[in-house]
């Protein structure tokens, strides 16, 4: 770690390359985890309802199963799995079917690479930098899944929360107390908004996964990060959500996933939360 800190000319390219590899794996998580969950839900539903057991082959696993063409099912060659560059070499089209390859693949890989470089630039090549990479990767995966399926899996939100709490036990970013309070207040704050909205309208304004994601971000950003995360995510959500509705020609009743906006706000607050608070206090004349 010290070697990379002393030689950033090697460390930053290494972080960028690592980010591309992780981004390729995150694409697999984004595509396959919801399918595995839906398959398990159907099995559980048949068991609970005491319906006849119907054999349904499980979807491809996340780690073991090799990558394949999403249209034809052909196993990909090794060079077709090279992150980002394979998409460029294939000019965004499948070699087997000729159909376009989703822009999601290179975007997720490139974004993850940029976030990994930003993590080590901000926190260095030690454990803090590693933790920032872990947080960034979880947020990318959850945002991708929420955008596609309007779902924030417990398989991602809860481990992220526990990782933040475990890190606080070693005072990685903060002591344990503000991390615990951040997780608790993060969950309760959005749950309260959800409950009040449901009482007033009879509708659910957000999913329970949003509560858990904010709890996870509270474990990483601490209690003082909750309010900035809520404010930033609400602002970003209002602006980008309105643009998306206008571009798609949808009405205001169309549900919009809130997870990506929480992820953006949480990432910003985690990286620059103290600077944001200090800047606001100086602007308000309170410091």
UniProtKB/Swiss-Prot annotation:
One of its GO terms (cellular component) is plasma membrane. The keyword S-adenosyl-L-methionine applies. It comes from the Bacteria. One of its GO terms (molecular function) is aspartic-type endopeptidase activity. Keywords: Cell inner membrane, Cell membrane, Hydrolase, Membrane, Methyltransferase, Multifunctional enzyme, Protease, S-adenosyl-L-methionine, Transferase, Transmembrane, Transmembrane helix. The chain crosses the membrane at residues 10-30, 101-121, 125-145, 177-197, 226-246, 253-273. Pfam families: A24_N_bact, Peptidase_A24. Its EC number is 3.4.23.43, 2.1.1.-. One of its GO terms (biological process) is methylation. It catalyses: Typically cleaves a -Gly-|-Phe- bond to release an N-terminal, basic peptide of 5-8 residues from type IV prepilin, and then N-methylates the new N-terminal amino group, the methyl donor being S-adenosyl-L-methionine. It is found in: Cell inner membrane. It is a multi-pass membrane protein. Plays an essential role in type IV pili and type II pseudopili formation by proteolytically removing the leader sequence from substrate proteins and subsequently monomethylating the alpha-amino group of the newly exposed N-terminal phenylalanine. Belongs to the peptidase A24 family. This is Prepilin leader peptidase/N-methyltransferase. It comes from Xanthomonas campestris pv. campestris (strain ATCC 33913 / DSM 3586 / NCPPB 528 / LMG 568 / P 25).
């Amino acid at each position: 770690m010290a070697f990379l800190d002393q030689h950033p000319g090697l460390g930053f390219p290494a972080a960028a390359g690592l980010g591309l590899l992780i981004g390729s794996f995150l694409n697999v998580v984004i595509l396959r985890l919801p399918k595995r969950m839906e398959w398990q839900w159907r099995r559980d539903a048949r068991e609970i309802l005491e319906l006849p057991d119907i054999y349904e082959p499980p979807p491809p696993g996340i780690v073991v199963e090799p990558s394949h063409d999403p249209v034809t099912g052909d196993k990909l060659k090794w060079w077709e799995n090279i992150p980002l560059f394979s998409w460029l070499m294939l000019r965004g089209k499948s070699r087997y079917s000729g159909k376009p390859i989703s822009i999601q693949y290179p975007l997720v890989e490139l974004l993850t690479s940029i976030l990994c470089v930003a993590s080590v630039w901000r926190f260095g090549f030690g454990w803090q930098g590693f933790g920032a990479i872990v947080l960034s990767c979880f947020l990318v995966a959850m945002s991708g899944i929420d955008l596609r399926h309007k779902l924030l899996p417990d398989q991602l939100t809860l481990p992220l929360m526990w990782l933040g709490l475990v890190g606080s036990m070693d005072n990685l970013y903060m002591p344990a107390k503000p991390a615990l309070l951040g997780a608790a207040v993060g969950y309760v704050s959005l749950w309260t908004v959800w409950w009040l909205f449901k009482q007033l309208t009879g509708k659910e304004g957000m999913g329970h996964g949003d509560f858990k994601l904010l709890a996870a971000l509270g474990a990483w950003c601490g209690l003082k990060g909750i309010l900035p995360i809520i404010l930033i995510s609400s602002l970003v959500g209002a602006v980008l959500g309105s643009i998306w509705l206008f571009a798609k020609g949808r009405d205001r009743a169309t549900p919009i996933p809130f997870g990506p906006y929480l992820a953006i706000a949480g990432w910003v607050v985690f990286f620059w939360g103290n600077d944001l608070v200090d800047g606001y206090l100086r602007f308000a004349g309170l410091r």
